[in-house]
UniProtKB/Swiss-Prot annotation:
Lineage, highest ranks first: Eukaryota, Viridiplantae, Streptophyta, Embryophyta, Tracheophyta
HAMAP family in the cross-refs: tRNA_methyltr_TrmB_euk
Residues annotated as transmembrane: none
Official protein name in the record: tRNA (guanine-N(7)-)-methyltransferase
EC category: transferase
């Protein structure tokens, strides 16, 4: 990005990228073949490019990613989680190229303007998480996965495109450690029931109790931290949440 373009697309007052220059379609077809690099295994992901502050002198990466925000949108949740869990590495996964570029520039700008070395623990990658989750994460690597306001794919013939389904939960259970949490939320009641039903039927997940939900500081961010959640709140809309734990074994 040349200096003239950068001056236009970045706010002079905050130093952050202006969202209107990164507009894209609300959703993309997750079953289409997009063109972006795909690692052949988690060992082939160079996370040092995403988290340079967590690389030792001998180029050894000292931490592993633990949180994944699937379909991270404009990165609102990542930004909030970064300061809540400053020692935890987390990555957003987004299919839309312009949105991914915006989140990347937003994170880099926050790193530059932060006086306390914050936001070094978050990053974003453009990928199709419905196809390539096992290419990025090892078995039991993640402790939290987020699916916030995903595309509802209203038509029945398109339900196979939904990011929560029985067969995809098999993959999510693989990369989540025992005790790991899946967070889902939507403003579409039918989709909320769908996601909850898929999780309830899957043998590797159990619902959190009301007491656990109240004590989890992440739960209140599901709406307040995301741009989509804020829009729903402004319009007085309802949200439908399902939060489930990955169990250790099936009895």
């Amino acid at each position: 990005m040349d200096n003239e373009t950068k001056a236009t697309t970045f706010s002079k007052s905050t130093g952050l990228p202006r969202k209107r220059f990164y507009r894209a379609r609300a959703h993309s077809n997750p079953l289409s073949d997009s063109h972006f690099p795909i690692p052949i295994s988690p060992a082939h992901v160079d996370y040092s490019l995403h988290f340079p502050k967590f690389v030792e002198a001998d180029n050894k990466f000292i931490k592993k990613v633990e949180f994944a925000d699937i379909g991270c949108g404009f990165g609102g949740l990542l930004i909030s989680l970064a300061t809540l869990f400053p020692d935890t590495l987390m990555i957003g996964m987004e299919l839309r190229d312009k949105v991914t570029e915006y989140v990347k520039e937003r994170i880099l700008a926050l790193r530059r303007t932060s006086s306390e070395g914050q936001y070094e623990n978050i990053s974003v990658v453009r990928t199709n998480s419905m196809k390539y989750i096992p290419n990025y994460f090892e078995k039991g690597q993640l402790s939290k996965m987020f699916f916030l306001f995903p595309d509802p794919h209203f038509k029945e013939k398109n339900h196979r495109r939904r990011v929560i389904s029985t067969h995809l939960l098999d993959e999510y259970a693989y990369v989540l450690r025992a005790g790991g949490i899946i967070y889902t939320i939507t403003d579409v009641e039918e989709l909320g029931e769908w996601m909850k039903s898929c999780l309830e039927k899957h043998p590797m997940f159990e619902s959190l109790t009301q007491e656990e939900l109240v004590s989890d500081p992440v739960v209140e961010l599901l709406c307040s931290a995301t741009e989509e959640g804020q829009k729903v709140a402004r319009n007085g809309g309802q949200t439908f949440r399902a939060v489930f734990r990955r169990i250790a074994y099936v009895s």
